[in-house]
Amino acid sequence: MNINGYTRMAAVVANPIKHSLSPFIHNLAFDLTNENGVYLAWEVEAEKLPAIVDNVRTLDMYGLNISMPYKTEITPFMDELSPAAELIGAVNTVVNQSGKLIGHNTDGIGFFNSLEKYHFNIQNKQMLILGGGGAAIAIIAQAALSGAKKIVVAARKSASYIPLKEKLEKLSVKTGIEILLTDLSEADRLQKELKQTDLLVNATSVGMDGESLPLEKSLVLPEKLLVVDAIYKVRETPFLRWAKGQGAQTENGLGMLIGQAAESFYLWTGKKMPVAEITLEMEKEA
């Protein structure tokens, strides 16, 4: 990395963020593509967000990545939102276009781009996704925008279940895609939906302990099913081991992590991130 008077900045903004892998990914991408940029991690309090946004314009930055807890809080500061960001109601990438700040959400498109190596396209396919948090909503919204045939969301019945149901109903109306919510504990219903499923995704945190499964292990998976776990800190979760044991193709969350970064990098620089090389380096770091 050769920092000089022409070097431009990008940064990830969150709290906490010092543990983030994003600086490693993006700075390696800058080096590999000969792009004169540097990427930092900024851990800031919520009241500093307006100043951070002003910095993007003042310092002519590429833009920002936004992580928890600011993905929704940052949206009012944007001049424009991409279709995905507007649909999701959250921004994870800010792009500076000559002072005009455009909010994008690359989580969903990054997720599906990471599945291209399996020649998987969600169009006219059915997805069953476990969980209803931010990552799940981004994946659901992108699946709907990409023309999925049907999306089934399985979540635990809790205080957030009814708000999730209402959010999914709005997504369904806006996109014209069938999106259903079911109780994650209803194994019979899940088994019925699994028979028609092409893509099974775990977007919960269950499995981070290396022991827990997010669903009943008695469930039988159909043939030719692609199974993905959004967790990347545990490279093969119990969920993926269980699916692999039934003959399914499996993918961990590292692809989504790098995929969303690659989409942000392209929006900032117009260059394709060398995903294969970066994935290899990330695996060495594990």
UniProtKB/Swiss-Prot annotation:
Keywords: Amino-acid biosynthesis, Aromatic amino acid biosynthesis, NADP, Oxidoreductase. Pfam families: SDH_C (PF18317), Shikimate_dh_N (PF08501). The active site is at K71 (proton acceptor). It comes from the Bacteria. Shikimate binds at S20, L21, S22, S67, N92, D107, Y232. Its EC number is 1.1.1.25. Pathway: Metabolic intermediate biosynthesis; chorismate biosynthesis; chorismate from D-erythrose 4-phosphate and phosphoenolpyruvate: step 4/7. Belongs to the shikimate dehydrogenase family. This is Shikimate dehydrogenase (NADP(+)).
